[in-house]
């Protein structure tokens, strides 16, 4: 029973390793959006059904003739009752420990996000609304950021006018609205779910960091494609001014210090 989840974890980890190896060449050849899309492969593998038992075992040769059954029964030695030894079911213990840590990981990020959202919105004031996305100003926002899946927000720092000129403000807002339009906030939660199941796996941690970097690069490319490369200087200035630490994994920040 344990082999199917283990097979899934191994297969998805191998896909993560493959994407880590090819993401840079793919980005150079086909663009950042294609490289970002590669990260769907490990997540899709996590929800695919396991291979049929006969394929995983390589297919056993059945005994088809009655005479073979009789011969096999006569030739088989009489079974010897093995002594019953009560002990720890280490497989069950390992599954339990894995599930506890995975659940704790998700609960931590859910709690962190809930506290962050409450603190940010408590002192926020409405600024604008674009489509279904509410734009707010908050002194708790370290820089422009997008968050929320059901209730969608873009938060801008309260000192927006003093930190960014008009062009930089427009580009920063376009970047964050792009995260909502592309479904990146949903992707962040899916990625956290995959990482929770792979909490023990260093490949998954490296893959998660690369996934977030590719997400930002793909969104940057979209903004520059829509606004034109003449906006590159103002966009770079907005990114530098917005860079900060302490990012929330479930949100999309304009850029963090680690990204730079």
Question: Can you say where each PLM-predicted feature lies in the sequence?
Answer:
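Short pre-active-site segment immediately N-terminal to the catalytic Zn-binding motif
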Residues: 155-173, 207
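Catalytic glutamate of the conserved HExxH
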Residues: 171-172, 176-185, 189-200
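Short helix/loop segments within enzyme catalytic domains
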Residues: 54, 111, 174, 181-182, ...
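Hydrophobic, aromatic-rich membrane-embedded alpha-helical segments
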Residues: 46, 148, 154, 190-205, ...
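Hydrophobic membrane-embedded segments
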Residues: 1-132, 143, 149-152, 160-162, ...
